Amino acid sequence: MGSLLQGFTKSLAMTFLSEIGDKTFFAAAILAMRYPRRLVLAGCLSALIVMTILSATLGWAAPNLISRKWTHHITTFLFFGFGLWSLWDGFKEGGGSEELAEVEAELDSDLKKTNDQSKNSKIEDEQKKQKRPFLTAFFSPIFLKAFSINFFGEWGDKSQLATIGLAADENPLGVVLGGIVAQTLCTTAAVLGGKSLASQISERIVALSGGMLFIIFGIQSLLTPVDA
């Protein structure tokens, strides 16, 4: 297992390049244009931090369920696999912001449904208030919306699986801290910069950079001896 600093550095670089042009990054940017920034930032960051901790915990537990040798080999395979996947995405990417447009369309559709529902009668509104989810009594609906979009957007994502693999091979605490710092930087930039910043990001460059980083991690993992 690597040092805390090594886990922190790898996680910081990997998470930053994975998230800077990711779907959740664009979602945070667009949500921040429509709702109070502090609620959007709090909801998005909370979801990403929870996901990072869950992923690192799974990675930490993996060597206790199967041998460290196998977790090391699986992690190496994941790094190479994600590296080739990202490079492929980068080479076929036209350089535009197709994902930004896709996320915006999804959020517009969701907003339209919300507006249609708000036109119901007062009786239906009262019934909805009575059936309001338990969490809305403690958290703002905007916070919960930002949280759910980011949490489920990250679930099963390439960055989540990579975090699990990294935590299985490196210091889990370092991986968590590096991931949280990177998530904070990316999400804050998205919320403050909004759509204007998101539209300036080259998905192609981000994908190629992330792919090369994964390949480097894969080579390093391949050359690193497995602890007994």
From Swiss-Prot:
GO CC annotations on file: endoplasmic reticulum; membrane
GO molecular function, one term: metal ion transmembrane transporter activity
Modified residues (N-acetylglycine): G2
Localization per Swiss-Prot or TrEMBL: Membrane
Bilayer-crossing regions: 12-32, 39-59, 71-91, 133-153, 173-193, 205-225
Family, as annotated: Belongs to the GDT1 family.
UniProt protein name: GDT1-like protein 5
Organism of provenance: Arabidopsis thaliana (Mouse-ear cress)
